[in-house]
Regions:
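Bacterial signal peptide processing site
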Residues: 27-34
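Short acidic/histidine-rich motifs immediately flanking catalytic phosphotransfer sites
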Residues: 109-117
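Catalytic-core regions built around general acid/base machinery
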Residues: 128-143
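Short helix-loop-beta junction
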Residues: 79-93
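Glycine-rich, charge-decorated loop segments at or immediately adjacent to ligand/cofactor-binding or catalytic sites
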Residues: 148-169
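Structural motif
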Residues: 98-110
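A charged, well-structured terminal subsegment
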Residues: 176-205
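Short beta->alpha junction loops
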Residues: 92-101, 123
Length: 209
């Protein structure tokens, strides 16, 4: 009798866990916008399907992962990661020497619960876009927003990635200008999916590096 009771209890617990998992999956699925990017779901055209992210908790629980460029030995990514840390948000620099490693680092970032991923624009080429789409789709499916960091001598018009995969195009420059979106605001407006421009411009001084 005791064994039978124990079996019933195990089955009951298993069913309960399954129900919780299914409900969690359903809630999460609803949190991913249908046609717009995670982290940039509020636009005038998509206001009716806006998905807010008001469960983000404390800033100290947020981590931004920055993927290295293969063209500058990661110097720009390290600069951005340092600036994010100084703004009060945790940041992880993810080194990569080859394109495949960059894509692997994106998946690593998603699987280690990064709240935002910054990818250099020069990682995307006509020949690699198909390969990248798999990783970007994976990040999107997990509700992790992506920011594309503008690379030297490249513009937004050079980016050939569907807009549903990236929340913002971020141009970070070293200069003394004060007309900009701060590092903190650029990251948090995407993490919290607050209304923002598709293109963000941030000026950081040499001292901030």
């Amino acid at each position: 009798m005791m064994k039978k009771h124990a079996v019933y209890r195990i089955v009951h617990i298993a069913v309960l866990l399954l129900v919780i998992a299914l409900l969690s999956a359903a809630v999460f699925a609803c949190s991913v916008p249908r046609k717009t990017a995670v982290g940039h779901s509020y636009t005038l055209a998509s206001a009716s399907q806006y998905v807010s992210r008001d469960d983000d908790g404390d800033v100290k629980d947020i981590r931004v992962d920055v993927i290295a460029s293969t063209r500058d030995k990661g110097s720009q990514a390290q600069r951005i990661a340092r600036s994010i840390e100084k703004s009060g948000i945790r940041a992880t620099y993810r080194a990569a020497k080859k394109a495949q490693q960059q894509r692997e680092q994106v998946r690593n970032a998603v699987n280690s619960y990064a709240r935002l991923i910054v990818i250099p624009q020069d990682a995307f080429t006509q020949h690699s876009n198909t390969l990248w789409e798999s990783e970007l789709s994976y990040a999107r499916s997990k509700g992790v927003p992506v920011i594309i960091n503008a690379s030297a001598n490249m513009q937004l018009t050079d980016l050939n990635i569907p807009s549903q995969y990236w929340a913002a195009y971020w141009d970070v420059r070293v200069s003394q200008s004060e007309a900009n979106t701060s590092i903190f605001e650029a990251a948090m407006c995407v993490v919290e999916d607050r209304p923002h421009n598709s293109t963000l411009l941030t000026h950081i001084s040499a001292q901030e590096e």
